Amino acid sequence: MSIQLITFDLDDTLWDVTPVMQDAEAALRNWLAMHAPRLGAVPVEHLWSIRATLLQAEPMLKHRLSELRRRILLHALTDAGYAHADAQALAEAGFQVFLAARHQVELFAEVHPTLEALANRFQLGVITNGNADVRRLGLADYFQ
C-alpha cells in the first residue's frame, strides 16, 4: 500500500498565524470604531464572556469558528444598543473585514516549492477548522 493523499492544516503549517490574526483583529477593531461607534472600546473580557456563553449553549460552535466570531460580534453589537437588524448587518460587514485581513498571510519560504513537488506525486488536501480559503490565498492549484 502506498501513500496517495497528504492533507495539511493551514495555520502554523504554511504560515505563522499569530501575526495574521493580530492584524485581522486590529483591522476589525478599527473598522468597528468607524462603523459601530456605540460599541466603543468593548473590553476583551466582555467578548470572552459572550464566547463562553455561546460555547456553553452550543459546544459544537468551537468547530465553526466563523459562525462563532459572527455570533460574538452580533451579541456585542446588540449589547451596545444596536437594533438586531443593524447589529446583524454590522456583524457581517465586520466579519468580512476580518476575513479579508485574515487572508493577508506571508507563506513560509518553502511552501510553494514543497507543495509543487508533493502535488506532482500525491493528491493534496486541506483539513482545517479555520476560515482560511486556499482559493483566496492563491494555493488552490496544489489541492484537490
Q: Which stretches of residues belong to each language-model region?
A:
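Residue-level preference for short coil/turn positions at secondary-structure junctions
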Residues: 1-2, 120
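N-terminal helical cap/lid subdomain that shapes the substrate entry/recognition surface
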Residues: 2-108
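Substrate-recognition element of Asp-dependent hydrolases with the DxDx(T/V) motif
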Residues: 89-104, 111-143
